[in-house]
Amino acid sequence: MATKFPSFSQGLAQDPTTRRIWYGIATAHDFESHDGMTEEKLYQKLFSTHFGHLAIIGLWVSGNLFHIAWQGNFEQWVADPLHVRPIAHAIWDPHFGQGAIDAFTQAGASSPVNIAYSGLYHWFYTIGMTTNAELYQGSIFMMILSAWALFAGWLHLQPKFRPSLAWFKNAESRLNHHLAVLFGFSSIAWTGHLVHVAIPESRGQHVGWDNFLNVMPHPAGLGPFFTGNWGVYAQNPDTMGQVFGSAEGSGTAILTFLGGFHPQTEALWLTDIAHHHLAIGVIFVIAGHMYRTNFGIGHSIREILEAHNPPQGTPGDLGAGHKGLYDTINNSLHFQLGLALASLGVVTSLVAQHMYAMPSYAFIAKDYTTQAALYTHHQYIAIFLMCGAFAHGAIFFIRDYDPEANKDNVLARMLEHKEAIISHLSWVSLFLGFHTLGLYVHNDVVVAFGTPEKQILVEPVFAQFVQAASGKAIYGFDVLLANTGGVAANANAAYMGGWMDAINGVRGSNDLFLPIGPGDFLVHHAIALGLHTTTLILVKGALDARGSKLMPDKKDFGYSFPCDGPGRGGTCDISAWDAFYLAVFWALNTVGWVTFYWHWKHLAIWQGNVAQFNESSTYLMGWFRDYLWLNSSQLINGYNPFGSNNLAVWAWMFLFGHLVWATGFMFLISWRGYWQELIETIVWAHQRTPLANLVGWRDKPVALSIVQARVVGLAHFTIGYILTYAAFLIASTSGKFG
């Protein structure tokens, strides 16, 4: 007899109810809880999954390259990137009538296609690809890379090739390897690609497999490098009149510090980007030699942490500092994952911001729908990564934290004064919430009653001052870079002339620091409310994960438990998992405000109508009417009794997203008993219905647990929310700008 699922838990495999299936899925990735799991086996399994992850990323890139080459219009787009719409892939759908076929036969295609809003065309073009053949070659290369990664993952699970636990616990060697080899070398290698391939292509000089060994990336060759005369590589940069992809206006510089944007592409200068990656690479290679391994040179992280404690007799006694942290972190995968997720979350949000404020890909700044899609995509990813960071921080406290090993150090002291931390976050959230909502509601009421001049409009003077210090001239603050005769401004003009043009939007619409006013002030504080409330829930979940005054023994119940039975009142909804669950709702709420703000402000700029945002964003009805309702109008006319247009698929997705979202509430509002009764009734009916009763099942059907129903509800709420806004965002932007 075959082993029943899940093979990793014999206890679950013998469960006679459908609980076996759902708990099996829920715990499939909780390797720590699996039968016969040792610490060494755990590390080896995780190590192998990294290669699987890399393979999936490689296949994703390969698939995109392949479909763009096969079904896209890359070569036509390269010839005229501002007027040709890039094609993602062909659509074949048996449901399409002639009207839909005509509507989706777009962008010069001969059959229905989807338009690409991923920015991949801009990326491929910027890094030096210009033909379909190159896309196919790239696709095959990524496929081979994925196969290699899958093989590596399999290999490292074989007995002879499994790394030992000691190898995984060698933090210094791993850090050096990641810093110097993975970050450092790959950054320098990328500089090499930019200098040898992308920059020549941008100047009309093709570099391919056929000629890359005999095309000099710089006329002076390596001479200046070996003689220390590096400035030669920055001389003779591209001119302001350079035509991207041609020799017209091109220079010979390969590593520059021009600042600002290429006037035609409105993207950062490729030679600036190459310089940036070279500098980053060199710094990381140096950083990768900092930590002491078996060579006996460099710093010991353990010694650094042990030394980081306050001098004895310090007023207020600051405790044992960082003592004990080395082993605490090195022995806890959840702690390490929490740190990694938090770092990646911040970086992803930064990517969202930088991709529009300082675009690095040629012409992407003019593809407004792509800009909106990429910003929204990266901010959504950032909130999930941040929520995950706190979730694993809480699991660390429950499963891995050792009070003895961390006596009186910074971790222990965080737990000891958690009430102060949580209550301060609570106070900040309440303050932001009441004041921001108060201002919005006041403004809404006075506008409704016909006296808009009575609105309370606060100029964000401090933020404007910061913008002025960075060179924004519009506000008239005579400070730092905005002080035209000052030392800072003169130095900036000498060293990075393009910066002031970029910051003040001199050329084109690419404005680094957008002008801000009372509408921005209000929505900034609404977003701050969302961020602080999300943080409050997440921080409270982690700090209370081991126990609280209400439930001192909470850690004994694990990460996710519904309640401690009926006899102990008030223990529902207080597991660390519940905090994560509640925080995701707030995180989604917040990212909604962030993306609404970004999108509306940019729609107003792109349409040349900034007054609409400035005047309507100071009261609630302005947001509902002039952002949400006004921008839904084209979308919901994607199909009607008179036919359909190329927004029809987004209009349908908009409705479908609402449906998925609303389904979530069915799981969130009705609890387990309701479903159990319903299931028992359905089973009764099934067994008494001819033909149907010929089909039975081995597992007794039972309702989902409370925690499972919540996660199913949360998943529907989240996915529906994302589908709805994605359809709205893409349709409302592409409907206006083509």
Curated annotation (Swiss-Prot):
User: What's any GO biological process attached to this entry?
Assistant: photosynthesis
Q: State the EC number(s).
A: 1.97.1.12
> Which GO molecular function annotations are given, in alphabetical order?
4 iron, 4 sulfur cluster binding; chlorophyll binding; electron transfer activity; magnesium ion binding; oxidoreductase activity
Give the matching Pfam families: PsaA_PsaB
Q: How does it assemble?
A: The PsaA/B heterodimer binds the P700 chlorophyll special pair and subsequent electron acceptors. PSI consists of a core antenna complex that captures photons, and an electron transfer chain that converts photonic excitation into a charge separation. The cyanobacterial PSI reaction center is composed of one copy each of PsaA,B,C,D,E,F,I,J,K,L,M and X, and forms trimeric complexes.
Q: What does this chain do?
A: PsaA and PsaB bind P700, the primary electron donor of photosystem I (PSI), as well as the electron acceptors A0, A1 and FX. PSI is a plastocyanin/cytochrome c6-ferredoxin oxidoreductase, converting photonic excitation into a charge separation, which transfers an electron from the donor P700 chlorophyll pair to the spectroscopically characterized acceptors A0, A1, FX, FA and FB in turn. Oxidized P700 is reduced on the lumenal side of the thylakoid membrane by plastocyanin or cytochrome c6.
Q: What is this protein called?
A: Photosystem I P700 chlorophyll a apoprotein A2
Tell me the organism: Synechococcus sp. (strain WH7803)
